[in-house]
From Swiss-Prot:
Protein name: Flap endonuclease 1
Binding of Mg(2+) 2, residues: D185, D187, D239
Subunit structure: Interacts with PCNA. Three molecules of FEN1 bind to one PCNA trimer with each molecule binding to one PCNA monomer. PCNA stimulates the nuclease activity without altering cleavage specificity.
Function: Structure-specific nuclease with 5'-flap endonuclease and 5'-3' exonuclease activities involved in DNA replication and repair. During DNA replication, cleaves the 5'-overhanging flap structure that is generated by displacement synthesis when DNA polymerase encounters the 5'-end of a downstream Okazaki fragment. It enters the flap from the 5'-end and then tracks to cleave the flap base, leaving a nick for ligation. Also involved in the long patch base excision repair (LP-BER) pathway, by cleaving within the apurinic/apyrimidinic (AP) site-terminated flap.
Keyword terms: DNA damage, DNA repair, DNA replication, Endonuclease, Exonuclease, Hydrolase, Magnesium, Metal-binding, Mitochondrion, Nuclease, Nucleus, Phosphoprotein
Length: 389
């Protein structure tokens, strides 16, 4: 889920923290920790085929095994490396106990989608079948293992986080091992990543720019410390606890900006008995849940940035061909062509970063505030939220 409404809030209240990167090559030379679970979900959703105008299905080999995740990981990783990026994939570890409630909700939503899919199939509505099929997509442990093996053979480093992938992405960036994190999850900022890239793994056919979001600039414009920003994110709505009914991102922002903490803001809400505001019982008492959520963001379980090995190696060509062609049914000529591109990309990775490709978001509210435009392509351009873990 990430943080509800945070992107829109930043576009309105801290627009200068967001930049559009029109060309991926502008990021050349940077190592980026990529949320692998999010990327896998994107590939499973986006890389599909439709026969005869019917509903789309994930790509499969002759044995009926899904290969969308491998196709996406292979092609998009090579594209990043050809543009000079140095990707480091970070996979999810065990889900935190506090996320059990959110995971249960996702399970319920999948059950609802399954029922809706059955009804749509009965009616033969291809559009609805496609829509509900995508809601049922999730990356399996086997998908993860397939991609880890693929990355190993490509010579691309990958890490399995002890817990949340985006938290370890942030830790690697804060520890100076990578420049930024690449994920659609806005809670990477809550975990403290200095620079966040969104849309890195989106298909180039969509022709939408990468978004760069800088945390320090966001905090400056919001006039908040990172601790206050964490409280804001919890109030907006996160994976670790239910939010307060009647308190959306704007009210949360105003509340934290004025009262500096959730504790102080809650005291005011209770005192004023604000209309339409319902504070969950778990937010009250001696051990309110928001304190545990705060701890999850400020002291997450992450990889040791200093001790983690990150090394890019030469691809193992023969083994890579065997894995993709013989085991997973890829076309050999295409795989060989892609391997040639992969090998050539090694020289590109040392290319200097080209700041001239950056485009500052346009002004909206004069000198004080510059409002960022809505995402191109509307909802279809925005990357779907994962059904991970």
């Amino acid at each position: 889920m990430g943080i509800k409404g945070l992107m829109k809030l930043l576009q309105e209240e801290a627009p200068s923290c967001i930049k559009e990167v029109e060309k991926m090559s502008a990021l050349a030379g940077h190592a980026v920790a990529i949320d692998a679970s999010m990327a896998l979900y994107q590939f499973l959703i986006a890389i599909r085929s439709a026969d005869g105008g019917g509903p789309s299905q994930a790509l499969t080999n002759a044995d009926g095994e899904v290969t969308s995740h491998l196709q996406g990981m292979f092609s998009r990783t090579i594209r990043m490396m050809e543009n000079g990026l140095k990707p480091v994939y970070v996979f999810d570890g065990k889900p935190p106990v506090m996320k059990s409630g959110e995971l249960a909700k996702r399970s319920d939503r999948r059950q609802e989608a399954q029922k809706a899919l059955e009804e749509a199939t009965e009616k033969g509505n291809a559009e609805d079948i496609d829509r509900f099929n995508k809601r049922l997509v999730r990356a399996t442990p086997q998908h993860n293992e397939d991609c880890k093996e693929l990355l190993r053979l490509m010579g691309v480093p990958h890490i399995t986080a002890p817990c949340e992938a985006e938290a370890s992405c942030a830790a690697l960036a804060k520890g100076g091992r990578v420049y930024a994190a690449g994920t659609e999850d806005m809670d990477a900022l809550t975990f403290g990543v200095p620079v966040l890239y969104r849309r890195l793994t989106v298909s180039p056919a969509k022709k939408i720019p990468i978004l760069e979001i800088r945390l320090e600039r966001a905090l400056q414009e919001l006039e908040m410390t990172h601790e206050q920003f964490v409280d804001l994110c919890i109030l907006c709505g996160c994976d670790y606890c239910d939010s307060i009914r009647g308190v959306g991102p704007k009210k949360a922002y105003a509340g934290i900006k004025e009262h500096k903490s959730i504790e102080n803001f809650l005291e005011v809400l209770q005192k004023n008995k604000s209309k339409g505001v319902v504070i969950p019982d778990e937010w009250l008492g001696e051990n309110p849940i928001y304190k545990n959520a705060r701890e999850m963001f400020i002291k997450p379980e992450v990889v040791d940035a200093k001790e983690t090995e990150i090394k890019w190696r030469d691809p193992q060509e023969t083994e890579l061909v065997d894995f993709l062609v013989k085991k997973h049914g890829f076309q050999e000529d295409r795989v060989l062509s892609a391997i040639t591109r992969l090998k050539k990309s090694k020289s590109t990775q040392s290319q200097k970063r080209l700041d001239s490709f950056f485009t500052v978001m346009p002004s909206a509210n004069g000198a004080k505030k510059r409002k960022a435009p809505a995402a191109k392509g509307g909802k279809k351009a925005a990357t779907a939220k994962k059904g991970k873990k």
